[in-house]
Curated annotation (Swiss-Prot):
InterPro entries: MetalPrtase_cat_dom_sf_prd, YbeY, YbeY_CS. Pfam families: YbeY. It is found in: Cytoplasm. Binds 1 zinc ion. GO terms for cellular component: cytoplasm. It comes from Bordetella avium (strain 197N). This is Endoribonuclease YbeY. One of its GO terms (molecular function) is RNA endonuclease activity.
């Protein structure tokens, strides 16, 4: 961690094996997301305690049905627990590996680039960003795009040719 950057405690759980998503890679992506959010300044936080869980189709579907009332597996599902009085943001991020892989193929993106985007998206949700209202969505998407650009990844919201 560089001086002035938010601290990160990251736990990773593998309900499914996914060799393309090692802990070091998820940590790196989460760090970029935290640095980007800190620079954005919308959410006041000093550190983050996050859990990332990689799941299969069945668990992804069950969690999405239980918590969002939608009977299908989604790509990323985030549980935000807020920022405590000491400035630590907490959240759980669930990434459904089969959905991620399918979307990457369908959108003609690399698996790693799409996984990077979904991880950053989940971290921003864990910090309190949302995209329900148009204004919030524009801000969150713009921040995701800036973070990804710093990592050399193209804007995920542009349509592929």
């Amino acid at each position: 961690m560089k001086a002035g950057e938010p601290g990160l405690a990251l736990a990773v759980q593998y309900a499914v094996a996914e060799p393309r998503l090692p802990r070091w890679r998820l940590r790196r992506w989460a760090g970029y997301a935290l640095a980007g959010a800190a620079a954005d300044g919308l959410i006041d936080f000093q550190a983050a305690e996050l859990n990332v869980r990689l799941v299969g189709q069945a668990e992804g579907r069950r969690l999405n049905a239980d918590f969002r009332g939608r009977d299908y597996a989604t790509n990323v599902l985030t549980f935000e627990y807020g920022v405590d009085p000491l400035g630590t943001a907490r959240g759980d991020i669930v990434i459904c590996a089969p959905v991620l892989a399918r979307e990457a193929r369908e959108q003609k993106k690399s698996f790693v680039d799409h996984a990077t985007h979904l991880t950053i998206h989940g971290v921003l949700h864990a910090l309190g960003y949302d995209h329900i209202k148009v204004r919030e969505a524009k801000r969150m998407e713009a921040l995701e795009t800036r973070i990804l650009a710093r990592m050399g990844i193209a804007d995920p919201y542009l349509l592929a040719d």
